[in-house]
Amino acid sequence: MIPQTLEQLLSQAQSIAGLTFGELADELHIPVPIDLKRDKGWVGMLLERALGATAGSKAEQDFSHLGVELKTLPINAEGYPLETTFVSLAPLVQNSGIKWENSHVRHKLSCVLWIPIEGSRHIPLRERHIGAPIFWKPTAEQERQLKQDWEELMDLIVLGKLEQITARIGEVMQLRPKGANSRAVTKGIGKNGEIIDTLPLGFYLRKEFTAQILKAFLDVKPL
């Protein structure tokens, strides 16, 4: 069922909290892979199916009619994020005139439904649990941090300084190659303004940033 309101979406997300991947997959008649080595997007697909997400692999938000993006957040036993979070691909060409205010990144992060999930690899996939959902909108300070990182990284792209981009740049968000392998190639702008072949780059939220979101939720959650 596709949720028609934020309340319906949150209610559906709360109804699957506490289930294991195996329990939810069996309910939806979805086969469970042994591990995620060849099925990296399986958990996201499972939760999208369970919650009625509409976007599929399109660039729009997962629940575009509600203005909500769905993000899974693998955490360890201490509740700390295990990996960075992919937001969107960076526009490496045809990017003149793009501002933070009309960027894909800002659009995707304007309202997020985070679903924490058990991510420790020693737990068999079928037995990993789904956590309680978190509705999140960036605070003014978080938006300032995201905008600052986005503008710094986009300046390097637009100015043809792709070779200067490293994962160390950015306070809360970084740019990293996005692709199944290093043979994935796209077009970008070279240092002399020419079009070159380069690796696709994606914006990723740092683990420290998503840990902050989790902590804020846990700090205000009633007992």
Swiss-Prot record:
<dbReference type="GO" id="GO:0006298">
    <property type="term" value="P:mismatch repair"/>
</dbReference>
<comment type="similarity">
    <text>Belongs to the MutH family.</text>
</comment>
<dbReference type="GO" id="GO:0006304">
    <property type="term" value="P:DNA modification"/>
</dbReference>
<keyword id="KW-0227">DNA damage</keyword>
<dbReference type="Pfam" id="PF02976">
    <property type="entry name" value="MutH"/>
</dbReference>
<keyword id="KW-0378">Hydrolase</keyword>
<dbReference type="InterPro" id="IPR011337">
    <property type="entry name" value="DNA_rep_MutH/RE_typeII_Sau3AI"/>
</dbReference>
<keyword id="KW-0255">Endonuclease</keyword>
<keyword id="KW-0234">DNA repair</keyword>
<dbReference type="InterPro" id="IPR011335">
    <property type="entry name" value="Restrct_endonuc-II-like"/>
</dbReference>
<comment type="function">
    <text>Sequence-specific endonuclease that cleaves unmethylated GATC sequences. It is involved in DNA mismatch repair.</text>
</comment>
<keyword id="KW-0963">Cytoplasm</keyword>
<dbReference type="GO" id="GO:0003677">
    <property type="term" value="F:DNA binding"/>
</dbReference>
<dbReference type="GO" id="GO:0005737">
    <property type="term" value="C:cytoplasm"/>
</dbReference>
<dbReference type="GO" id="GO:0004519">
    <property type="term" value="F:endonuclease activity"/>
</dbReference>
<dbReference type="InterPro" id="IPR037057">
    <property type="entry name" value="DNA_rep_MutH/T2_RE_sf"/>
</dbReference>
<dbReference type="InterPro" id="IPR004230">
    <property type="entry name" value="DNA_mismatch_repair_MutH"/>
</dbReference>
<protein>
    <recommendedName>
        <fullName>DNA mismatch repair protein MutH</fullName>
    </recommendedName>
</protein>
<keyword id="KW-0540">Nuclease</keyword>
